[in-house]
Regions:
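Membrane-targeting and insertion segments and their boundary/processing signals
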Residues: 10, 42-46, 71, 75-79
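C-terminal capping alpha-helices of c-type cytochrome domains
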Residues: 68-116
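Gly/Gly-Pro-rich "capping" loops immediately C-terminal to redox-active cysteine motifs
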Residues: 14-18, 30, 34-68, 87, ...
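Short, solvent-exposed linear motifs at loop/edge-of-secondary-structure regions
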Residues: 1-3, 37-38
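The canonical Cys-X-X-Cys-His
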Residues: 21-31, 101, 105
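Electrostatic cytochrome c docking/interface patches
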Residues: 2-21, 116
Length: 116
């Protein structure tokens, strides 16, 4: 029974994801404006390197990746494993924290689509 619990996928919690975003991501990202990195509101389900506000690297512009749970999880764990040669130097080892951040970004993207 303990092995089954340990093997269960992380539960995503957008509220905790917001807190993790503030702690882990806000040094370089905001939701709506360019900082060091692109704004992240609406990033979920968008093709990588396509926000018209941001001057992406050639690696990001030519990436054939769309941001979903799987690609965002791999990206947050090791950016170079998803888009080699990108300019984001970041790794987040905690799968629960990654799941929470992804849930937050997914929720923001869903809310953004409902208001437009």
């Amino acid at each position: 029974m303990c092995a089954a619990i340990a093997a269960a996928p992380p539960v995503d919690e957008p509220g905790r994801g917001r807190d993790a975003f503030e702690k882990r991501c806000s040094g370089c990202h905001t939701l709506d404006k360019i900082k060091v990195g692109p704004p992240l509101r609406g990033v979920y389900a968008r093709k990588a390197g396509t926000d018209p506000q941001f001057p992406y690297s050639d690696a990001m512009k030519s990436a054939s990746v769309s941001w979903d749970d799987s690609t965002l999880d791999r990206w947050l764990a090791d950016t170079d494993s998803v888009v080699p040669g990108n300019e984001m130097a970041f790794r987040l080892n905690d799968p629960v924290e990654r799941a929470n951040i992804i849930a937050y970004l997914r929720q923001l993207s869903s809310a953004s689509k409902r208001t437009h």
